[in-house]
Amino acid sequence: MSVLTFLKPRGSSSVARERLQLILAHERAERSETGRPDLIITLREEILNVIAKHVTVERDKVQIKLERGEGVSTLGVDIEFPVDAISKAKPKAKRAIA
């Protein structure tokens, strides 16, 4: 970039493009924040269904949290198992080795 280009006033198209990019980024961030509860509810139900195959767990004892950071998302799952549920867990069928 030369000095003349640097000092030249920017055109309206580049200013409009930057404004549009800011608006789109804001809308995407807003949509992803409001869309997360649906994802968390779906994940919670699927996780509960998988766990129910092995152990009986009260649905209100499962907490799921989704955190988004820069370039990475973290899914946290906290499940409170009753002591007797672990001892009564359905045993996994063993495969015969041929």
From Swiss-Prot:
Transmembrane segments: none annotated. It comes from the Bacteria. One of its GO terms (biological process) is cell division. Keywords: Cell cycle, Cell division. SUPFAM superfamilies: Cell division protein MinE topological specificity domain. Belongs to the MinE family. Prevents the cell division inhibition by proteins MinC and MinD at internal division sites while permitting inhibition at polar sites. This ensures cell division at the proper site by restricting the formation of a division septum at the midpoint of the long axis of the cell. This is Cell division topological specificity factor. It comes from Methylorubrum populi (strain ATCC BAA-705 / NCIMB 13946 / BJ001). The gene is minE.
